[in-house]
């Protein structure tokens, strides 16, 4: 098998490793004084989306994290990180609250995709994702999204229409899973590795395509030096973004470039 083909899917499998730090691990180690807020104020809550208030060094921020858990016992009540409409609407409520109180927003993304069950469709999963995208596009406060492991389809994008998109070196970002792609295109699960390579879903691919703005090295992943470095990087970037009077306009322009094959910057 082609080494490049097998390599892309190997990175996907590594990103799915249950031992990798999850959203709650980042909240506990990067931020301080975290206060979790519950409910979408429309009648539901979703434990797969953890959100609330915290300090990043001395800066009050709103944190939104997709949480999988590590063990099967932890993952089942959190739907293995597949966020339901109630979770995205909770995130929407906290985004609007952040806008009202002038707090930057940090999103931690780790999902194979949004919830796709019958109840999710009945409760408006598509609309919930669309509302988040609309809200993120118009926020006047700085917003940074970090893909910490899996970044699957619209479920990830719903928390990633942001000023900066960072990816851990071992994360991936894709419109569809390699398994789903192989099934749709070729009806052949044996071509999953080939699909992974075709999707250009690794962090290196995303940076080259300017879908991601920064790759975070995984040296000391899950250890204090790693979290300390990330905290410092976030604080510095929020300070820079907070001084930009054209934040919303630049965010809009960044995403409007996607799919523009005539762009002369070499991204597409």
Task: Please annotate each region the language model reported.
Residues 1-183, 197-268:
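Terminal-region recognition feature
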Residues 178, 188-189:
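Catalytic-center loop of serine/cysteine hydrolases
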């Amino acid at each position: 098998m082609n080494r490049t083909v097998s390599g892309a899917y190997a990175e996907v499998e590594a990103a799915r490793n249950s031992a990798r730090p999850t959203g709650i691990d980042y909240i506990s180690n990067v931020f301080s004084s975290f206060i979790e807020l519950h409910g979408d104020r429309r009648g539901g809550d979703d434990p797969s989306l953890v959100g609330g208030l915290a300090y990043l060094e001395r800066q009050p921020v709103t944190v939104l994290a997709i949480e999988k858990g590590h063990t099967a016992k932890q993952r089942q009540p959190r739907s293995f990180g597949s966020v339901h409409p109630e979770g995205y609407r909770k995130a929407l409520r906290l985004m609007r609250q952040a806008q009202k109180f002038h707090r930057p927003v940090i999103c931690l993304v780790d999902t194979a995709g949004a919830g796709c069950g019958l109840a999710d469709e009945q409760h408006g999963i598509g609309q919930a994702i669309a509302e988040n995208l609309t809200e993120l596009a118009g926020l006047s406060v700085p917003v940074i999204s970090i893909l910490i492991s899996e970044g699957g389809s619209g479920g990830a994008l719903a928390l990633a229409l942001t000023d900066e998109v960072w990816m851990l070196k071992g994360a991936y970002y894709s419109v569809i899973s390699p398994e789903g792609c192989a099934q749709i295109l070729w009806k052949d699960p044996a071509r999953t590795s080939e699909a992974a390579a075709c999707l250009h879903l690794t962090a290196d691919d995303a940076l080259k395509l300017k879908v991601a703005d920064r790759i975070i090295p995984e040296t000391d992943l899950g250890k204090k030096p790693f979290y300390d470095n990330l905290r410092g990087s976030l604080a510095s970037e929020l300070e820079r973004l907070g001084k930009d009077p054209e934040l919303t306009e630049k965010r809009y322009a960044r995403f409007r470039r996607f799919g523009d094959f005539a762009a002369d910057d070499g991204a597409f």
